[in-house]
Design a protein with these regions (language model features):
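Surface-exposed interaction/gating patches
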Residues: 24-31, 36, 118-192, 196-212, ...
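Extreme N-terminal starter segment of soluble prokaryotic enzymes
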Residues: 20-22
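Short acidic/glycine-enriched loop/turn segments that link adjacent beta-strands
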Residues: 64-67, 187
Length: 258
């Protein structure tokens, strides 16, 4: 039986995976301001966060919501998260640009705090090189984040099901599963930035060559007997409500891209 063991920062470094703690952040922005924030973020808020120990994993445009900006960042553990966020938000770069950033936002509190479901299920970023400041070539790749909601903590048997049945089936139909996480239930160590409490989620990320490849995958799901007969019903039996699917287009400087 699969064991959802909490990964230490030492394990993460030795395995080349990122990260033991991950934030999935969805911002609702003022109409027409998404590219304004992305330009500011990609120029000012990547290296400045990484200089204090934050891993900026990826930044995205949500293709289904023109005024939503989604991004991911990671930490070694909850203690270092508190220090890193204190250093960044108390530092000169954020102070210089916070008014411009905040002016683009309606809401920035839609945040899920996550940890890898398994020691091997974090992001592998070793071969993903971030383009330099000033790059404007937007990748064609699509990153899809699927959020499953549960009535209680994600059970070990669901992780077994995902590993042994769901993941092989999805892979065979064209999905490249990148990483998967469950809720990190530790107390928020930086309360100045709220996170969503009381949630029990399993979030998995997949990467596609482009939007057309994802649409082909969705079509293949509906035509697959294996999916209909062996996977879909089991999946629905675990879930507390309908899944949430985020179709995410990486920005020009997103590290997570393809």
């Amino acid at each position: 039986m699969t064991q959802p063991i909490r990964e230490s920062s030492k394990q993460a470094r030795s395995s080349g995976l990122c990260c033991p703690v991950v934030e999935l952040r969805q911002y609702t922005l003022q109409p027409g301001k998404r590219d304004v924030l992305i330009n500011l973020f990609d120029r000012e808020f990547i290296e400045s966060q990484e200089s204090v120990g934050i891993e900026v994993i990826g930044q995205f445009r949500d293709l289904d919501h023109s005024d939503r900006f989604v991004w991911l960042r990671g930490f070694r553990d909850m203690t270092s998260r508190a220090k890193a966020l204190t250093d960044f938000y108390g530092g000169p770069v954020w102070k210089a640009h916070r008014e411009a950033a905040n002016a683009t936002m309606i809401d920035s509190d839609n945040v899920l705090l996550l940890r890898p479901a398994l020691p091997t299920s974090g992001f592998s970023l070793e071969n993903m090189k971030r383009p330099p400041v000033g790059s404007d070539d937007v990748p064609k790749n699509l990153v899809v984040a699927t959020i499953y909601y549960f009535e209680g903590p994600v059970a070990v048997d669901f992780i077994d099901f995902f590993e042994q049945e769901f993941k092989p089936a999805a892979t065979s139909l064209g999905a490249r599963v990148s990483a998967y996480f469950v809720t990190e239930n530790s107390e928020n160590t930086f309360p100045a930035l709220p996170v969503r409490g009381g949630e029990n989620v399993f979030v998995w990320f997949s990467i596609f060559q482009d939007l057309a490849a994802y649409e082909n995958y969705v079509a293949a799901l509906s035509q697959s007997e294996r999916w209909r007969d062996e996977v879909s019903g089991q999946l629905e039996s675990y879930l507390g409500r309908a899944p949430e699917v985020l179709k995410l287009s990486p920005t020009s400087r997103s590290q997570l891209r393809g």
